[in-house]
Amino acid sequence: MKIIKLSNGVEMPQLGYGVYQVTPEECERCVSDALSVGYRMIDTAQAYHNEEGVGRAVKKSGIARDEVFIVSKIWISNYGYEKAKTSIDESLRKLQTEYIDLMLLHQPFCDRYGAYRALEEAYREGKLRAIGVSNFYPDHLIDLASNVDVKPMVNQVETH
């Protein structure tokens, strides 16, 4: 598996297993299967409503936590500093982990600046190993990066 080194030195698998549109009921089984065939990055999001299934599968897998790279994303209804801060802790609880490897802002809407401040704080506290954004166009990314202390380490984009 190819590894990418992020700007802060965190190593991330280049390829991962995404659980978008995987029902909460099926998520644990699907992630367990993905881990059993060698996937070591699992990509979920608050909006997918299946973080708990990811957490259960990783916990039950017997694979050391530091060998599984977990990505999640804060949904726009949780933007703003306080809501984002609370939602990060909720994701940690659902994923049954003390840290998330990469946490992203899911979309460039609403109070993304407040939400990103919450990411920065959780990153400094060690709750998040890396932070970034998802689905940001270049102008959104440049604007955000110009107004924060910790630059986004990832801009995850959907391609077909």
Locations of regions flagged by a protein language model:
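N-terminal binding-site loop/beta-alpha segment at the start of enzyme catalytic domains
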Residues: 1-68, 98
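Conserved, mostly hydrophobic/aromatic
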Residues: 17, 34, 42, 54, ...
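Acidic-and-aromatic substrate-binding clefts and catalytic sites of carbohydrate-active enzymes
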Residues: 22-25, 45-53, 77-82, 108-113, ...
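Short, acidic/polar
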Residues: 22-35, 79-96, 114, 137-143
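Short acidic capping loops at alpha-helix termini that bridge into adjacent secondary structure
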Residues: 64-68, 98-102, 126-130, 151-154
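A short, structured active-site edge motif that brings together acidic residues
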Residues: 65-78, 101-108, 135-138, 156
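CE4/NodB-like, metal-dependent polysaccharide N-deacetylase domain
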Residues: 84-105, 121-125, 147
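Beta/alpha (TIM)-barrel catalytic core signal, keyed to glycine-rich beta->alpha loops juxtaposed to Asp/Glu
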Residues: 107-160
